[in-house]
Amino acid sequence: MFLKGRRCEIQGLGIGAFVYYRRVVEDQKDRILAEIIKVAQAISAPAEAIAALQAAQSEHQFGKAMDDVKDAIPQRLLIEGQNPLTLLHSALSKGVHNHSDETCLGLATDIRLVLGELAELLGHALKDERELKKAVSRLRRLPS
């Protein structure tokens, strides 16, 4: 789905790219939230934030799920100080019928960039936590 969106984007098909990327975000909502939950748990985020993220996974309405977690995203996953899920929801909620193909192409590019950055931040956060735990474990085993 993502690759189809990327192909449309490269070909300048804004509405097509927008629709494919919207499907990626909506279809992968639970998976994205699961990764965010892993980061939240790894960094010992407040229990309320983790509970909100878990509840959003059960929510069938994409918009409601995003509204429910707008304050639950760990700081280290913010992009330019902004919640990436809120940014994505804001772009996606406008709908293709309200925009020209050119505008949809710009939005599709923005959605792809935010998705990519979120994926990188998730990967780095989980890797950093694993590496830190290993380092602490190794240092604790050193003889006194």
Predicted segments, located by residue:
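A short mid-domain helix/strand-loop element embedded in enzyme catalytic domains
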Residues: 1-4
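Amphipathic, oligomerization/interface secondary-structure segments
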Residues: 9-144
